[in-house]
Each structure stands twice: as structure tokens, then as C-alpha cells.
Curated annotation (Swiss-Prot):
Its EC number is 4.4.1.15. This is Putative D-cysteine desulfhydrase 2, mitochondrial. It comes from Oryza sativa subsp. japonica (Rice). It is found in: Mitochondrion. Catalyzes the production of hydrogen sulfide (H2S) from cysteine. The modification N6-(pyridoxal phosphate)lysine is found at residue 90. PANTHER family: 1-AMINOCYCLOPROPANE-1-CARBOXYLATE DEAMINASE-RELATED, D-CYSTEINE DESULFHYDRASE 2, MITOCHONDRIAL. It catalyses: D-cysteine + H2O = hydrogen sulfide + pyruvate + NH4(+) + H(+).
Amino acid sequence: MRPSPALAGGGRTVANLLSATEWMLPSPATQVHTISVLPSHSPPSPPHHFAFSNLTTAPKRNGGKGEEEGRPRFEVVRDDLLHPLANGNKARKLDALLPLLRRRGATDVVTCGGCQSAHAAATAVHCAEWGMRPHILLRGEQPDIPTGYNLISLMFGNVAYASRSVYAHRDEMLYNHARKVAGTGGTVLWADDISKEDFVLDEDNGCEIGSRRVVIIKEGAGDVQALLGVIRLVEYLYNLSSFHKHENVHVVVDAGTGTTAVGLALGAVCLGLHWRVTAVMLADTLERYKEREKSLISDFKKLCHNNYHEMVGENDIGDSLVEWVERFSPRRFGKVLNGEIALCRQIAQQTGILLDPMYTLAGWEQAVDLCVGDSRTKVVMIHTGGTLGFCGLAQRYSSHFTSDEQT
């Protein structure tokens, strides 16, 4: 493993923090696929003017040379393959958090999300795996036919539905539900309230035997401890031989809560890497994302106490690490535009990689634009998973899912 640049100085580094952390995932390893961007030979109008080839999995022709030679390309970090049901950045954000909660004596976990929330489903699955009872609050009404992530949440967790008016006050809703779960003799704790010492010390949780200890995880796992799993991913990528020769690395990720983007940027800073992180804003305004970034960085500094400045050394550039950008076709969150499902189908058929039009397609389009515009930079897209969301989309946009004859 390559030593981090700050390690040579003898100070405490992020590597020390990561090595002292218990993880949910057995390994940070993930597949990285190389995608070649080709001019399209088919007639569809822009923006569908590219074709794609997966150079990692496609058979090599002509001794490995062909029309892909010299074409723009980018890397896709296949975190969608981490787990059959609960993968992507949803698993990364729980990587350090769930073992910590179990060690702290958590018996139950409460979180929330939309009806097809990948985060809620991931929390339900992984909590069940780790012996904690998951309680999931989903926005809206129960669908007539449970499918996709809604079905996964129902199978692994204890699901309740909240009206949109109640859901609008998330913190109050989560706390009230957690109090009901805890009962008269139980305790309720927010995940963000667990201090840095909890990462290195086993403590008596002070609960009565048999009582419930309920921990609340924010919507989308936007908690400071979620950053560590993402930073662990950055360290893993940094140590891959394919990344060694590239000083200029540009990482692209779609942003829901923005936590993953901040974790990627913090990981790069703490490891002394001159990586750029661009996040495609999908669910909020630029001002809100910047506020969340500032808050997460502040919480991370508190988590590390006096060790934060030793970790980042001269690399600290304040509270603005992420480049937040609009999606190429901005829209109200959750809306799918004409042609986007067809584009996801095209990409799946040409590369074997399934994207969803609400999240990962936005990151893919950004990565394509960057690699076409700058061949000197290694462009890396983080696949954040979420592909089971297609099950819900197929119900909402049934006319877009047809068995057209393939040519």
C-alpha cells in the first residue's frame, strides 16, 4: 500500500483513523471499469450523439486496438456491485456508522426516505445483517404493489408511512417515532451526537438490561460518521496501480444530500491528493449544498478534535472543497425527461452498466462531457447504485418501458 503523503511527516494521518475503525464492508475493494466514448452511428438527435464501449469487459479485437484507440475515455467506480440489494454510496455511508452503533449498544435504528428510497432500503438490509432492528419512515402512501426499494424496505425493516405534511418536519418526525420505539425505559440518540472517542473506545452504554437503545440516522445518512466510509474508498482508489501515474484526477458524483461528495473531497485533502471533486446537484439549491458542506466539514473537524489539522497539513483549503454544478438539463427533483430512459437502456446494452435517470445518469453525462473536453485528466465517475429504483419508475412511466424490436 502506498503511504499517504502526510504520513512521511510523522504526524497523525487519516490512515490512522481508518485503521482504528471497525467496518461494515469486509473490504473497501470495488471494480473500476474503463468506458470509451465513441461517435454515434445511429440517427437519434442530441444529446444522444455518443456511443459507448466497456473496455474492461468487452472482448479485445485486433490485438486490443480498434475504433476505441485514442478515443476519450473515463473510469466508472462500480460501487453498484458492492451488494446485491444495498450498494453504492448508501453502503459506503453506513460502512463506519453501523459497526459503531452496534458497539455502542444500539438495539434499533430509525431513518427515513422517499417511497423508493435506496438509503432506507440499505439501512434496513444492513441493520438486519448486523443484528439491529431497522425502523423505516417512508414519505407518502403505501403503493398498491410494493416493488423496488420499497419492497426491500418492507422485507427487511419495520416500515411506517408518513404524510407529506408530517414528513416536512423530518427531525421532529424521526424523534417522535424513535421515542415510540424506545418505550418508557429506552433511550434515544442521534447518530451525529456520538463523539470521536466512540471510534476508539468501548464504553458502557448505561442502559438497563433489556431496554431499547434507539439511534436516529438522518435522511440519506447525512451524518458526519458517514464521511469515513467514503474517505476509505478514496484511500483504496489512491492505492490502485491505475491511479499511480495520474496526478490530475477529476472525480464526478451525483449529489442527493451531498455527503458523498464532501467525503470524497475530504479524503483527497487528507491524503494530500490534488483531485478535483465535482458534484451534480439534484435535490437542492447551490446555497443549501454549500451550507451542508460547511456543516459536514465543521462536524468532521470536531470528530477529529485537534488531529484534523495534522491530517490535512497544508492541504486544508477551508470549507469549500467541492465544485457544485447544475445538471445539464435541470428539473424538479424526481422528474424524468423524455429520452432519458432510452439513453439508460442504450448505455446498459453497450456497456453492461445500468444507470438510473434520476441520479447516476447525471453523473455519467458530466463524466462524458469532461473526458471529451480534456484528454489529459483522468475522469472518474462514482456509480452510486440505486438501480432498483427502476422498478418504481417502470410503474410511473410504463409507456417508456416497451419491448421494442432490437436491431
